[in-house]
């Protein structure tokens, strides 16, 4: 049986402040670092190990991976960083407080922007200081690849190439894979793996710092999936994510 482990980064400073983060490169809080280390312990207690890891080019995910691998004594394994695993780009919402945005635009509209499949938030202007096209880490991307805003559909479309061309072949070789990424890039992968409908994906929330294990068959089709840790605490963490945009 194949086991794939997914992990959303630990709590970031903007998670704590309940702000739309997107591609902004904010770091973990002290609690987020603890979450990352605890994730490593949960993985270790489950008897899981890895041959290779994948993460984004954003420090909250990279540092989460470092902390987890440190606990696992696996800091030596290859790590592939890719912009394709970045959080979805929240466009002009990036940096705004979610509750304040809900009070301004209404909870229903903000839920559509946060969780719908094909409705992106308002776009950034290219002269906005938040535009990622001036960031060195994206220097090799074509202008069309640099988002001004993204819906989940856009995130799926940029994530799947690295899954199909890079990660999936490694799994088929028998390598044990860990993916540390973000709420929406992981939602994109979960939607693909579980074949979740565009309507049902609205209700999927992934908490910070809790390992999600997928057991896959030889065709990489899910047999089952489950979070590692105290199930009641995990349920509360999922509910907390769902309630972030309440006015």
UniProtKB/Swiss-Prot annotation:
The keyword Cell wall biogenesis/degradation does not apply. Gene3D superfamilies: Phosphoglycerate mutase-like. Pathway: Carbohydrate degradation; glycolysis; pyruvate from D-glyceraldehyde 3-phosphate: step 3/5. Keywords: Gluconeogenesis, Glycolysis, Isomerase. Its EC number is 5.4.2.11. One of its GO terms (molecular function) is phosphoglycerate mutase activity. Substrate binds at residues 8-15, 21-22, 60, 87-90, 98, 114-115, 183-184. GO terms for biological process: gluconeogenesis; glycolytic process. The active site is at residues 9, 87. The record marks 182 as: Transition state stabilizer. It catalyses: (2R)-2-phosphoglycerate = (2R)-3-phosphoglycerate. Belongs to the phosphoglycerate mutase family. BPG-dependent PGAM subfamily. Catalyzes the interconversion of 2-phosphoglycerate and 3-phosphoglycerate. This is 2,3-bisphosphoglycerate-dependent phosphoglycerate mutase. It comes from Chlorobium limicola (strain DSM 245 / NBRC 103803 / 6330). The lineage of its organism: Bacteria, Pseudomonadati, Chlorobiota, Chlorobiia, Chlorobiales.
């Amino acid at each position: 049986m194949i086991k794939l482990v997914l992990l959303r980064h630990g709590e970031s400073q903007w998670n704590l402040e309940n702000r739309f983060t997107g591609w902004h490169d904010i770091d973990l809080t002290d609690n987020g670092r603890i979450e990352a280390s605890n994730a490593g312990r949960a993985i270790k207690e489950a008897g899981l190990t890895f041959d290779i890891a994948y993460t984004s080019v954003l420090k909250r995910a990279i540092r989460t991976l470092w902390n987890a691998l440190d606990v696992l004594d696996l800091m030596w394994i290859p790590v592939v960083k890719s912009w394709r695993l970045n959080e979805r780009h929240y466009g002009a919402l990036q940096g705004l407080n979610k509750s304040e945005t809900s009070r301004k635009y209404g909870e229903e509209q903000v839920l559509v922007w946060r969780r719908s499949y094909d409705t992106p938030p308002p776009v950034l202007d290219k002269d906005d200081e938040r535009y990622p096209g001036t960031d060195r880490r994206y220097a090799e991307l074509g202008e069309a690849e640099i988002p001004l805003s993204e819906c989940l559909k856009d995130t799926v479309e940029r994530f799947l190439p690295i899954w199909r061309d890079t990660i999936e072949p490694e799994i088929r070789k028998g390598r044990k894979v860990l993916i540390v990424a973000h709420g929406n890039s992981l939602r994109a992968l979960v939607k693909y793996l579980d074949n979740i409908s565009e309507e049902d994906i609205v209700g999927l929330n992934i908490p910070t710092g809790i390992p999600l294990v997928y057991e896959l068959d030889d065709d990489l089709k899910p047999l089952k999936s489950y979070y590692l840790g105290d199930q009641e605490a995990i349920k509360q963490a999922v509910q907390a994510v769902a309630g972030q945009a309440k006015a």
